[in-house]
């Protein structure tokens, strides 16, 4: 009987210390879609070199909100680094949105950024440039190699916890202290 993969959408992937790839080391990825064809998510703890004000200006969207202009944009992953992805908690019908899970949504359309600039956007939002993608079976293979922990998605972690605490904070949600893990075993 074939094994049916379980969808990891609405879960966080937490990179284990043994994952040394420069893009994903110590990263936390929110999985937005996962099926037999692959998976797509965004990193939620990697700062980019851009502010939201710079991104909005590039798109000819103006705002007088200094806090919004200064907000850090995250590096969402190596796929489509020129595209914006907004993780948020607002169920309104934006032009291009996907329900990730209970109270978590992914929007890729301009209308959400325009609403944010007018002060009418979601109460909580994380803007990323780029996303992460896994081909069919690739994520499952990485999980079997112990590259990632899986943790149920947590809006408080995604929106409120400081970036530098998200990696350990996500693992601690399931009782794991990443600083106590080793990537070897054997006899003395």
UniProtKB/Swiss-Prot annotation:
Pfam families: DUF179. It comes from the Bacteria. Gene3D superfamilies: VC0467-like. GO terms for cellular component: cytosol. Coiled coil: none annotated. PANTHER family: UNCHARACTERIZED PROTEIN YQGE (PTHR30327), UPF0301 PROTEIN YQGE (PTHR30327:SF1). HAMAP family: UPF0301. NCBIfam families: PRK00228.1-1 (NF001266). Belongs to the UPF0301 (AlgH) family. This is UPF0301 protein Smlt1098. It comes from Stenotrophomonas maltophilia (strain K279a). The lineage of its organism: Bacteria, Pseudomonadati, Pseudomonadota, Gammaproteobacteria, Lysobacterales.
């Amino acid at each position: 009987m074939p094994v049916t993969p379980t969808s990891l959408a609405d879960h966080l992937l937490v990179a284990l210390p043994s994952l040394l790839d420069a893009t994903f080391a110590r990263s936390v990825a929110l999985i937005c879609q996962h099926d037999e064809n692959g998976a797509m998510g965004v990193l939620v703890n990697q700062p980019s070199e851009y502010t939201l004000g710079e991104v909005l200006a590039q798109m000819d969207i103006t705002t007088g909100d200094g806090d919004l202009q200064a907000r850090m944009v995250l590096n969402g992953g190596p796929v489509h680094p020129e595209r914006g992805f907004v993780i948020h908690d607002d169920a309104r019908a934006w032009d291009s949105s996907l329900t990730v899970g209970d109270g978590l949504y992914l929007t890729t359309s301009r209308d959400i950024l325009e609403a944010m600039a007018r002060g009418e956007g979601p109460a909580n939002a994380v803007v990323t440039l780029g996303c992460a993608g896994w081909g069919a079976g690739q994520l499952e293979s990485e999980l079997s190699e112990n590259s990632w922990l899986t943790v149920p998605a947590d809006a408080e972690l995604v929106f409120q916890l400081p970036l530098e605490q998200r990696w350990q904070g996500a693992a601690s949600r399931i009782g794991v202290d990443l600083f106590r893990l080793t990537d070897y075993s054997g006899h003395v």
